[in-house]
Amino acid sequence: MASLKKSLFLVLFLGLVSLSICEEEKRENEDEEEQEDDEQSEMKRGLWSNIKTAGKEAAKAALKAAGKAALGAVTDAVGEQ
């Protein structure tokens, strides 16, 4: 009976040790995944910022060109009269 108790305690102890090791590895993996997600989010934010800035610059250039064309057309129309 005593040897059965010792065996049972040994099995339970080894089970708890392996469980704690697995939980620790799981936490480490979750931390690594979280860091990767943070890095990807930062990259996306940076990329989106660059796209947004380029879009603004393109819109400004297009509006400036359209304004010059309209001004030229008005000037030509006034000059013809």
UniProtKB/Swiss-Prot annotation:
It comes from the Eukaryota. Keywords: Amidation, Amphibian defense peptide, Antibiotic, Antimicrobial, Cleavage on pair of basic residues, Secreted, Signal. Residues 24-48 are annotated as: Disordered. Coiled coil: none annotated. Residues 23-44, 80-81 form a propeptide. Residues 1-22 form the signal peptide. It is found in: Secreted. Its main location: secreted. The modification Valine amide is found at V78. This is Dermaseptin-B7.
